[in-house]
């Protein structure tokens, strides 16, 4: 039994931030009913290549993107732009605990699927809206995109090499980190609202914004600006407050050192056979190493060219100084620690019994995450869910009219 067993989620969201939230809730045991457009589905179904291979290695039309964020969900294909489709959503909403949606601000009002409308049907509902800029303010009605928010929030201003370095300039993060973080924050907010409901007896509205989330996630960098009045700048892989805490080039490739305190720096110097650095007062304390990083880093950089990355990593690791390699994703998923922690899981899939996905990182002792089913086919569960309040004949008629899609009989 999952931790959220008995919680029903009506998921009207698409693409990533909302579906990521829904998948976490589904992994934790909630029944997540994903509403999709008939014959089209979630936009990300067609965001390939890469496409998922079938049992014989042939490419299907199932995108890798969709597969990463929709496991454990029930796909119901309903045209919410029609009165008949809206009536179906109302029936689901009557028994739902949670609604997730990520339409533009106000877009669902015309369909009667906004919080005001659904909370009249079900006052206990927790309704989470995810938008680019929130429900109010001068940009509230604009659509939001992860890449745009990375730029607007200041994240890209501190990501990448400085302008005066070869290849310098603002960079986005390699995954849609704003969407992912918003999905995480939304999950936290939903669970908090469910607990609050157990005390108050009523649901509530949650207003989540991509921009709000990423500004909050600036964390120490945002606080550094508020404390100093100076905007942090791009420093490549260096840390603004800790030295050495960056990548270094060995004889063959780069590796990472992350000295978090003065003792670790002392041990580093011993490990790499460079104890004379400790005789320089500029390098003994971290605050001085930060001040004189332009003197220390060239010395270390030249020294590290003498051996391979593996040699340095083994030597430094022996003295328990934080050090690591830079893996490709292929190497990361084959990393023995990742294998031991079962981060790559097999889930039976209608097209490939050897379907693999990256699993949940949540490890619960009494109510562990379970993988009930692979990401669904479009409309795979339409009949299963809608038959709770519609007859087979009624469903067949709705499919004939194009109101619903999927397996009916």
Predicted features, each with a name:
Residues 243-319, 323, 395:
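Aromatic-enriched alpha-helical interface/lid elements that frame and gate functional surfaces
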Residues 168-178, 249-252, 367-370:
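Flexible glycine/proline-enriched surface loops and loop-helix/loop-strand junctions
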Residues 1-189, 193-199, 377, 383-409:
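N-terminal helix-loop segment corresponding to the beta1-alpha1 unit
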Residues 318-372:
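A glycine-rich dinucleotide-binding beta-alpha-beta segment and adjacent secondary-structure elements
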Residues 161, 183-203, 216-227, 269-276:
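Oxidoreductase and adenylate-handling cofactor-binding alpha/beta cores
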Residues 284, 352-401:
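Flexible, small-/acidic-enriched active-site or ligand-binding loops
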Residues 135, 165-176, 198-214, 233-240, ...:
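Conserved Rossmann-fold dehydrogenase catalytic segment
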Residues 39, 133-134, 210-215, 252, ...:
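Glycine-rich beta-alpha junction loops
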């Amino acid at each position: 039994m999952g931790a959220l067993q008995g919680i029903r989620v009506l998921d009207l969201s698409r693409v990533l931030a909302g579906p990521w939230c829904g998948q976490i809730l589904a992994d934790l045991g909630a029944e997540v009913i994903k509403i999709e457009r008939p014959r089209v589905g979630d936009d990300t179904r067609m965001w390939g290549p890469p496409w998922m291979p079938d049992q014989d290695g042939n490419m299907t039309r199932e995108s890798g993107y969709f597969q990463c964020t929709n496991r454990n969900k029930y796909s119901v294909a309903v045209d919410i732009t029609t009165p008949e489709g809206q009536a179906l959503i109302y029936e689901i909403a009557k028994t739902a605990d949670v609604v997730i949606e990520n339409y533009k601000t106000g877009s669902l009002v015309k369909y009667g699927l906004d919080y005001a409308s659904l909370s009249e049907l079900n006052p206990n509902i927790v309704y989470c809206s995810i938008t680019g800029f929130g429900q109010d303010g001068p940009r509230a009605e604009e659509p939001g995109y992860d890449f745009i928010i990375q730029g607007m929030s200041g994240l890209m201003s501190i990501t990448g090499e400085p302008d005066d370095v070869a290849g310098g300039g603002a960079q986005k993060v390699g995954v849609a980190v704003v969407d992912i973080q918003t999905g995480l924050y939304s999950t936290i907010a939903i669970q908090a609202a469910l607990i609050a409901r157990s005390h108050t007896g009523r649901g509530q509205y949650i207003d989540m914004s991509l921009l709000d989330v990423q500004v909050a996630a600036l964390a120490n960098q945002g606080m550094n600006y508020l404390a100093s009045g100076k905007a942090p700048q791009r420093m490549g892989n260096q840390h603004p407050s800790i030295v050495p805490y960056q990548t270094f080039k060995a004889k063959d490739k780069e590796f990472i050192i992350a000295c978090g305190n003065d003792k670790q720096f002392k041990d580093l110097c011993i490990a790499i056979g460079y104890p004379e650095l400790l005789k320089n007062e500029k390098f003994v304390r971290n605050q001085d190493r930060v001040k004189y990083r332009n003197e220390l880093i060239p010395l270390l950089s030249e020294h590290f060219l003498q051996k391979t990355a593996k040699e340095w990593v083994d030597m430094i690791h022996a003295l328990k100084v934080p050090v690591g390699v830079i893996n490709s994703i292929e190497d990361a998923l084959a990393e023995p620690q990742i294998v031991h922690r079962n981060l790559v899981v097999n889930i039976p899939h209608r097209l490939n019994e050897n379907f693999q996905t990256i699993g949940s990182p949540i490890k619960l002792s009494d109510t562990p995450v379970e993988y009930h089913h692979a990401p669904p086919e479009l409309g795979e569960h339409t009949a299963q869910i809608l038959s709770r309040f519609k007859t087979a004949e009624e469903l067949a008629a709705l499919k004939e009219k194009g109101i619903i899609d999927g397996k009916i009989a």
